[in-house]
Amino acid sequence: MRDNIDGHFLLIGLMAYPIRHSLSPQMQNTIYSKLDVPYVYLAFEVDQEKLPDAIKGLRALGLRGSAVSMPNKQLVCQYLDKLTPAVKMSGACNTISNDNGVLTGYNTDGIGYMRMLKEAGVDVIGKKMTIMGAGGAATAIVVQAALDGVKEIAIFNQKDECYQKIEAVAKKLNQNTQCKVYVTDLDDKEQLRKEIAESVVLCNATGVGMKPLEGQSLITDPTMLRADLVVTDCIYSPRKTKLLEIAEQQGCKILNGIGMMLWQGAAQIKIWTGEEAPIEYVKEKMGFND
């Protein structure tokens, strides 16, 4: 617990519902303490009904900014003054920066995923990846990957409302980037096999593998995976999902969602404080090296 908090400290929030399970306050405050910077990070239970008032409160109280999570990532965009290209493309914001009363919306989820790959020595720039999922995390990853220079992205999802939304995002990316992006029904297993065979990275950005779907995997046939494929899962609890277990048995390099969570948080800290987050220190303090 920091004992030097005074009137010069600035508050950074997290607006989501539910929120009590989040690891972000522990991670962020661990970093601020280590860096000895005058910031405190607190979680606030804010649903969509309370969001407009919460943004007014952020402005009125002069918060340095706020993280934004479900169910507010899309709705919050209409209350902000500026949006980054990634937010405009994805339609979702997970980070607000308050700069002298001007609120700018960022999305660091995709940044965190791409940085995780880079730190793990995985080069996907100019190459192809396959991603399963079409929700907020998947959309952020697809958008950032396209903006960063990934050549081709194959998206697989069930034909639900998210499918239609990600089709619209894919259309924007095809029109505004050099990346070829397309969406296919997840039930088409032969097409999924073909796209994975042509990809250097496979990403699971669905909830399959975490509670209440723990122990399940969208990939059930191990022969769809090869040893030189990098398999990533946005889930970090459990640390090793069924998909990652299958991939590891096939000799694949595997990455869980901890790296994405840490690096997206580091990107937020850079936005809010201008400082580089001591990621290795955080991993040690929070037991992520175990």
Residue ranges and their predicted role:
Residues D3-A120:
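Phosphate/diphosphate ligand-binding glycine-rich loop within oxidoreductases
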Residues A16, G105-G110, G126-L147, N157, ...:
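Glycine-rich adenosine-cofactor-binding loop
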Residues V122-K128, L225-A227:
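Short helix-loop-beta connector
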Residues D148-T177:
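NAD(P)-binding Rossmann-fold cofactor-contacting core
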Residues C179-I254:
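Rossmann-like adenosine-cofactor binding region
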Residues D228-V230, C234-D290:
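Adenosine-phosphate binding glycine-rich loop
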